[in-house]
């Protein structure tokens, strides 16, 4: 089972904190519990690198402290906790802490930093970068698909939390790259 559902960003989480908690924390915990009860061998949870909060000075790995104080990141961490405690030798649980996804799709999301910059460059001829020194893990949609496929194909005894991103950039670097395109 791959859980891709839930509230997808900070503004939506802040708009409806209770719905955010239900969709990002309670639902994956319940679905993973029912999956295990039904004999499913693996549960994959689409988490987020937002669990680390925002940083100017550091890059994070899976052992880094989770310091998010925003409802979205908190709910994704609660979702991880809700699914990970079910892992055992008969039920593998993988949580993928995804970077900010970017890339072309049939249903473009223009609330994502790279996609927003491209849209603004194309429609307004300019890119605005606030806080250019903030680091963001960026995750191309093709790399995201590969991460989920590899999670499906992983040996049965693999469980854990994994950061997945294509690369790390500052918002200023992203603006420069988009501007050069």
Predicted features along the sequence, with ranges:
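Glycine-rich NAD(P)-binding loop of the Rossmann-fold in SDR/ketoreductase-type enzymes
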Residues: 15, 19-30, 66, 70, ...
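Conserved Rossmann-fold NAD(P)-dependent oxidoreductase catalytic core, especially the SDR/UDP-sugar
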Residues: 3, 29-71
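Conserved catalytic-core motifs of eukaryotic protein kinase domains, centered on the activation segment
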Residues: 11-19, 54-58, 106-107
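NAD(P)H-binding glycine-rich loop region in Rossmannoid oxidoreductase-like domains
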Residues: 1-23
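The catalytic Tyr-centered alpha-helix of NAD(P)H-dependent dehydrogenases
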Residues: 57, 68-75, 98, 106, ...
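A conserved pocket-lining segment of Rossmann-fold NAD(P)-dependent short-chain dehydrogenase/reductase
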Residues: 13, 93-107, 116-139, 163
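Active-site Tyr-X1-5-Lys
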Residues: 54, 67-97, 122-123
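C-terminal substrate-binding subdomain of Rossmann-fold SDR/epimerase-dehydratase oxidoreductases
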Residues: 124-125, 129-181
